[in-house]
UniProtKB/Swiss-Prot annotation:
Cofactor: Zn(2+)
Provenance organism: Rhodopseudomonas palustris (strain BisB5)
Protein name: 7-cyano-7-deazaguanine synthase
Keywords tagged on the record: ATP-binding, Ligase, Metal-binding, Nucleotide-binding, Queuosine biosynthesis, Zinc
Catalytic activity: 7-carboxy-7-deazaguanine + NH4(+) + ATP = 7-cyano-7-deazaguanine + ADP + phosphate + H2O + H(+)
HAMAP family in the record: QueC
Pathway: Purine metabolism; 7-cyano-7-deazaguanine biosynthesis
Protein's job: Catalyzes the ATP-dependent conversion of 7-carboxy-7-deazaguanine (CDG) to 7-cyano-7-deazaguanine (preQ(0)).
Residues noted as binding ATP in the record, renumbered to the chain: F14, S15, G16, G17, Q18, D19, S20, A21, T22, C23, L24
Domain of life according to the entry: Bacteria
Gene expressing this chain: queC
Annotated CDD domains: QueC-like
Keyword Nucleotide-binding in annotation: yes
Protein backbone atom coordinates (compact mmCIF):
# COMPACT_ATOMS: atom_id res chain seq x y z
CA UNK A 1 0.00 0.00 0.00
CA UNK A 2 1.41 3.35 -1.04
CA UNK A 3 1.74 6.03 1.62
CA UNK A 4 -1.01 8.63 1.67
CA UNK A 5 -0.48 12.38 1.59
CA UNK A 6 -2.57 14.75 3.69
CA UNK A 7 -2.37 17.66 1.23
CA UNK A 8 -3.62 15.82 -1.86
CA UNK A 9 -7.02 14.95 -3.32
CA UNK A 10 -7.93 11.28 -3.62
CA UNK A 11 -10.42 9.49 -5.85
CA UNK A 12 -12.13 6.56 -4.09
CA UNK A 13 -13.78 3.66 -5.90
CA UNK A 14 -17.12 3.90 -4.09
CA UNK A 15 -19.66 1.23 -4.96
CA UNK A 16 -21.90 1.54 -1.91
CA UNK A 17 -20.53 -1.62 -0.31
CA UNK A 18 -18.88 -2.28 3.04
CA UNK A 19 -15.34 -2.26 1.72
CA UNK A 20 -15.66 0.89 -0.35
CA UNK A 21 -17.40 2.72 2.50
CA UNK A 22 -14.53 1.78 4.82
CA UNK A 23 -12.03 2.92 2.19
CA UNK A 24 -13.86 6.23 1.92
CA UNK A 25 -13.47 6.76 5.66
CA UNK A 26 -9.79 5.82 5.37
CA UNK A 27 -9.29 8.38 2.60
CA UNK A 28 -11.17 11.09 4.48
CA UNK A 29 -8.85 10.58 7.43
CA UNK A 30 -5.75 11.04 5.24
CA UNK A 31 -6.44 13.38 2.34
CA UNK A 32 -7.40 17.04 2.12
CA UNK A 33 -10.23 16.36 -0.31
CA UNK A 34 -11.92 13.20 -1.55
CA UNK A 35 -13.93 12.52 -4.70
CA UNK A 36 -15.75 9.27 -5.44
CA UNK A 37 -16.42 7.15 -8.49
CA UNK A 38 -18.91 4.32 -8.96
CA UNK A 39 -19.62 2.08 -11.94
CA UNK A 40 -22.90 0.91 -13.42
CA UNK A 41 -21.98 -2.15 -15.46
CA UNK A 42 -25.28 -4.02 -15.46
CA UNK A 43 -24.61 -5.77 -12.17
CA UNK A 44 -27.44 -7.74 -10.55
CA UNK A 45 -26.77 -5.92 -7.30
CA UNK A 46 -27.05 -2.43 -8.80
CA UNK A 47 -28.94 -1.50 -5.63
CA UNK A 48 -25.48 -0.90 -4.17
CA UNK A 49 -25.25 2.27 -6.25
CA UNK A 50 -28.47 3.54 -4.69
CA UNK A 51 -26.96 3.08 -1.22
CA UNK A 52 -24.26 5.65 -1.84
CA UNK A 53 -26.44 8.71 -1.21
CA UNK A 54 -27.47 7.61 2.28
CA UNK A 55 -23.92 6.58 3.07
CA UNK A 56 -22.64 10.01 2.07
CA UNK A 57 -25.33 11.69 4.17
CA UNK A 58 -24.17 9.54 7.06
CA UNK A 59 -20.53 10.47 6.55
CA UNK A 60 -21.44 14.15 6.63
CA UNK A 61 -23.40 13.64 9.84
CA UNK A 62 -20.60 11.73 11.56
CA UNK A 63 -17.94 14.40 11.08
CA UNK A 64 -18.05 18.06 9.99
CA UNK A 65 -14.41 17.64 8.94
CA UNK A 66 -15.35 14.72 6.68
CA UNK A 67 -18.29 16.71 5.32
CA UNK A 68 -15.97 19.55 4.33
CA UNK A 69 -13.60 17.16 2.55
CA UNK A 70 -16.21 15.34 0.47
CA UNK A 71 -16.11 16.38 -3.17
CA UNK A 72 -17.91 15.27 -6.31
CA UNK A 73 -19.41 11.80 -6.64
CA UNK A 74 -19.12 10.44 -10.19
CA UNK A 75 -20.93 7.52 -11.82
CA UNK A 76 -19.68 5.95 -15.04
CA UNK A 77 -21.81 3.59 -17.11
CA UNK A 78 -19.90 0.64 -18.59
CA UNK A 79 -22.62 -1.55 -20.17
CA UNK A 80 -20.02 -3.22 -22.37
CA UNK A 81 -18.63 -5.04 -19.33
CA UNK A 82 -21.95 -6.80 -18.83
CA UNK A 83 -22.30 -7.47 -22.55
CA UNK A 84 -19.00 -9.34 -22.75
CA UNK A 85 -19.32 -11.11 -19.39
CA UNK A 86 -21.20 -14.32 -18.70
CA UNK A 87 -21.12 -14.35 -14.90
CA UNK A 88 -23.46 -14.64 -11.94
CA UNK A 89 -22.99 -10.92 -11.26
CA UNK A 90 -24.27 -9.92 -14.69
CA UNK A 91 -26.68 -12.78 -15.49
CA UNK A 92 -29.60 -14.35 -13.62
CA UNK A 93 -27.82 -17.65 -12.99
CA UNK A 94 -27.02 -19.64 -9.87
CA UNK A 95 -23.77 -18.84 -8.11
CA UNK A 96 -21.37 -21.77 -8.41
CA UNK A 97 -17.70 -22.67 -8.68
CA UNK A 98 -16.26 -22.82 -12.18
CA UNK A 99 -13.97 -25.44 -13.66
CA UNK A 100 -11.03 -23.05 -13.25
CA UNK A 101 -11.51 -22.95 -9.47
CA UNK A 102 -12.99 -19.45 -9.49
CA UNK A 103 -16.59 -18.68 -8.55
CA UNK A 104 -18.77 -17.63 -11.46
CA UNK A 105 -19.18 -14.26 -9.73
CA UNK A 106 -15.75 -13.36 -11.13
CA UNK A 107 -16.14 -10.70 -13.82
CA UNK A 108 -12.92 -10.93 -15.89
CA UNK A 109 -11.05 -7.65 -15.99
CA UNK A 110 -13.53 -5.77 -13.81
CA UNK A 111 -11.05 -4.23 -11.38
CA UNK A 112 -8.54 -3.60 -14.17
CA UNK A 113 -11.22 -1.71 -16.09
CA UNK A 114 -12.50 0.14 -13.02
CA UNK A 115 -9.05 1.33 -12.03
CA UNK A 116 -8.15 2.33 -15.58
CA UNK A 117 -11.35 4.36 -15.98
CA UNK A 118 -10.78 5.87 -12.53
CA UNK A 119 -7.24 6.82 -13.53
CA UNK A 120 -8.50 8.46 -16.72
CA UNK A 121 -10.99 10.55 -14.74
CA UNK A 122 -8.36 11.31 -12.11
CA UNK A 123 -5.97 12.50 -14.83
CA UNK A 124 -8.53 14.99 -16.12
CA UNK A 125 -9.21 16.25 -12.60
CA UNK A 126 -5.56 16.50 -11.57
CA UNK A 127 -5.75 13.67 -9.04
CA UNK A 128 -2.83 11.26 -8.58
CA UNK A 129 -4.13 9.15 -5.67
CA UNK A 130 -6.76 6.45 -6.24
CA UNK A 131 -8.18 4.30 -3.43
CA UNK A 132 -9.76 0.87 -3.92
CA UNK A 133 -11.10 -1.84 -1.64
CA UNK A 134 -9.26 -4.77 -3.23
CA UNK A 135 -8.17 -7.46 -0.78
CA UNK A 136 -6.47 -10.83 -1.06
CA UNK A 137 -6.70 -11.82 2.61
CA UNK A 138 -10.39 -12.65 2.98
CA UNK A 139 -11.79 -12.84 -0.55
CA UNK A 140 -13.21 -15.11 -3.25
CA UNK A 141 -9.95 -15.73 -5.08
CA UNK A 142 -10.38 -13.11 -7.80
CA UNK A 143 -6.99 -12.63 -9.49
CA UNK A 144 -7.61 -8.92 -10.08
CA UNK A 145 -7.83 -8.37 -6.32
CA UNK A 146 -4.27 -9.53 -5.67
CA UNK A 147 -1.57 -7.12 -4.59
CA UNK A 148 0.79 -8.07 -7.42
CA UNK A 149 -1.97 -7.31 -9.93
CA UNK A 150 -2.62 -3.88 -8.41
CA UNK A 151 1.08 -3.03 -8.25
CA UNK A 152 1.57 -4.06 -11.88
CA UNK A 153 -1.43 -1.97 -12.94
CA UNK A 154 -0.14 1.02 -11.00
CA UNK A 155 3.11 0.81 -12.96
CA UNK A 156 1.29 0.39 -16.28
CA UNK A 157 -1.05 3.33 -15.65
CA UNK A 158 1.81 5.56 -14.52
CA UNK A 159 3.79 4.70 -17.64
CA UNK A 160 0.80 5.02 -19.97
CA UNK A 161 -0.20 8.41 -18.59
CA UNK A 162 3.34 9.71 -18.03
CA UNK A 163 2.30 10.63 -14.50
CA UNK A 164 2.99 9.13 -11.08
CA UNK A 165 -0.32 7.46 -10.19
CA UNK A 166 -0.67 5.86 -6.76
CA UNK A 167 -3.15 3.04 -6.14
CA UNK A 168 -3.92 2.72 -2.43
CA UNK A 169 -5.46 -0.53 -1.15
CA UNK A 170 -5.92 -0.13 2.61
CA UNK A 171 -7.80 -3.45 2.93
CA UNK A 172 -5.33 -5.59 0.99
CA UNK A 173 -3.97 -7.41 4.04
CA UNK A 174 -7.05 -7.17 6.27
CA UNK A 175 -9.66 -9.88 6.67
CA UNK A 176 -13.32 -8.91 7.01
CA UNK A 177 -13.13 -8.80 10.81
CA UNK A 178 -10.23 -6.38 10.56
CA UNK A 179 -12.20 -4.32 8.04
CA UNK A 180 -15.03 -3.95 10.55
CA UNK A 181 -12.43 -3.00 13.17
CA UNK A 182 -10.90 -0.42 10.85
CA UNK A 183 -14.32 1.21 10.46
CA UNK A 184 -14.61 1.30 14.25
CA UNK A 185 -11.15 2.85 14.56
CA UNK A 186 -11.86 5.49 11.91
CA UNK A 187 -15.39 6.54 12.77
CA UNK A 188 -16.43 4.77 15.96
CA UNK A 189 -19.73 2.99 16.43
CA UNK A 190 -21.49 5.65 14.32
CA UNK A 191 -19.55 4.56 11.22
CA UNK A 192 -20.01 0.86 11.98
CA UNK A 193 -23.76 1.39 12.38
CA UNK A 194 -23.89 3.38 9.14
CA UNK A 195 -22.14 0.60 7.23
CA UNK A 196 -24.38 -2.06 8.75
CA UNK A 197 -27.56 -0.19 7.88
CA UNK A 198 -26.83 1.47 4.55
CA UNK A 199 -24.02 -0.34 2.72
CA UNK A 200 -24.76 -3.24 0.40
CA UNK A 201 -22.74 -6.40 -0.20
CA UNK A 202 -25.15 -9.14 -1.32
CA UNK A 203 -24.49 -10.37 -4.86
CA UNK A 204 -28.21 -11.04 -5.39
CA UNK A 205 -29.20 -7.48 -4.53
CA UNK A 206 -31.35 -8.60 -1.59
CA UNK A 207 -32.40 -5.73 0.70
CA UNK A 208 -35.43 -7.34 2.33
CA UNK A 209 -33.73 -9.53 4.91
CA UNK A 210 -32.05 -7.70 7.83
CA UNK A 211 -29.26 -9.44 9.76
CA UNK A 212 -27.08 -8.17 12.57
CA UNK A 213 -24.38 -7.41 9.96
CA UNK A 214 -26.75 -5.68 7.52
CA UNK A 215 -29.00 -6.60 4.60
CA UNK A 216 -28.59 -9.51 2.21
CA UNK A 217 -29.63 -13.00 1.23
CA UNK A 218 -27.28 -14.45 3.85
CA UNK A 219 -26.22 -17.26 1.51
CA UNK A 220 -24.10 -15.87 -1.33
CA UNK A 221 -20.29 -15.71 -0.96
CA UNK A 222 -20.34 -11.95 -0.33
CA UNK A 223 -22.90 -12.27 2.47
CA UNK A 224 -21.02 -15.23 3.95
CA UNK A 225 -17.75 -13.29 4.12
CA UNK A 226 -19.43 -10.21 5.58
CA UNK A 227 -21.31 -12.25 8.19
CA UNK A 228 -18.21 -14.24 9.18
CA UNK A 229 -16.21 -11.06 9.59
CA UNK A 230 -18.96 -9.49 11.67
CA UNK A 231 -19.09 -12.47 14.02
CA UNK A 232 -15.33 -12.43 14.52
CA UNK A 233 -15.24 -8.66 14.99
CA UNK A 234 -18.16 -8.73 17.44
CA UNK A 235 -16.55 -11.52 19.47
CA UNK A 236 -13.36 -9.49 19.88
CA UNK A 237 -15.30 -6.32 20.70
CA UNK A 238 -17.00 -7.89 23.69
Amino acid sequence: MTEASSDHTALVLFSGGQDSATCLAWALSRFARVEMIGFDYGQRHAVELDCRAKLLDGFRAISPEWAAKLGDSHTLAIPTLSAISDTALTRDVEIAMGADGLPNTFVPGRNLIFLTFAAALAYRRGIADIVGGMCETDYSGYPDCRDDTIRALQNAISLGMARDVKLHTPLMWRDKAATWQLAQDLGGSALVDLIVEHSHTCYLGERGARHDWGYGCGECPACALRAKGWREYSAKAR
